[in-house]
Amino acid sequence: VAVINQKVTENYAIYNSDCMEVLPGLESNSIGVSVYSPPFPEMYQYSNDPRDMSNVATYEEGMQQYQFIINEIFRLTRPGRLTCVHCMDLKRGSYFQRDFPGDIIEAHEKAGFNFVCRVSIWKDPWLIARRTRMKSLRHKNICEDSATVRIGPADYVLVFKKGWNNDEKIVHATGLKTYAGAKEIPEELVRQFKNYSGDQRKNLLSHWIWRNYASPVWMDIRSGRLLPYNEAAETEEEKHVCPLQLDVIERLLTLYSNPNDVCLTPFLGVGSEAYMAVKMGRKAIGTELKPSYFRQAEKNLSKAGDVEIIVEENELPGMEEEDEFDDDVPTWLANSLDRQFRSSTNEV
């Protein structure tokens, strides 16, 4: 196996290597769940390594390479268990969009997975406009020609299952007790049901959490709840080195894994999925091709449970100071409108 570096402990094993150098050597039917965000073809270049999926010549070639990885994940996944893929629609030209999630679904079904569900993750369109300089999201376009405007892109999580029969059920015998998100659990529910030992069908705290997790749109994912990532960024990368939010990972691991399950992430990045798996009492296997990302992941995992950061949304990568693009709404007003919008969606 062409491994540049590695760190193997009792709770996790991470490899600085091309995932296709590592995955074929893992045991079939050994992974309880996989959670990851694949490279987005034609969107970013993460490194100059020819093995990097971001260095493909075309979108179609990127999907062909990705198919090999999906096939391996299918082989590794235990029967009845799941894989969760974070993705989004991709740009096609300067205005139109490509259905990347649809192609991911097709590729997984080709490998043998069954498509289970899709959850949308809400993102503030104004912040997206600032971060990406997406002119089609500018309010001034509504005034000038709304035929040129578009809807802000959501993130998605696609969930797939291998077969049906699960040899080890994922059980929450005392219901759901912790919540990953910006909403505050009503105090009355916490007081009455935190240590509830009766009929769990009547556990209203667990019901409240489940109702939010089962929602087709996750409205309160904290976009700034991340792992440290700045040290992994190299020249000209700051705008797209942004790890997957820990709230998303925590929800998926809660729903689709048991303690001590082995959780796989073939695109480790700075270690977010592996970190959360270890923090939640799971085991983790991860691969990362880029040395700077791997070093940051190694550092983050060495402090699992005590390294999370909270980044303000206007401080995320690519969110420079206000400039000529921000000709519609000043930051203070946009933040105020955002708070009002979020509070209006917190009713359950």
Please annotate each region the language model reported.
Residues 2-9, 298-313:
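Short, conserved SAM-binding/catalytic segment
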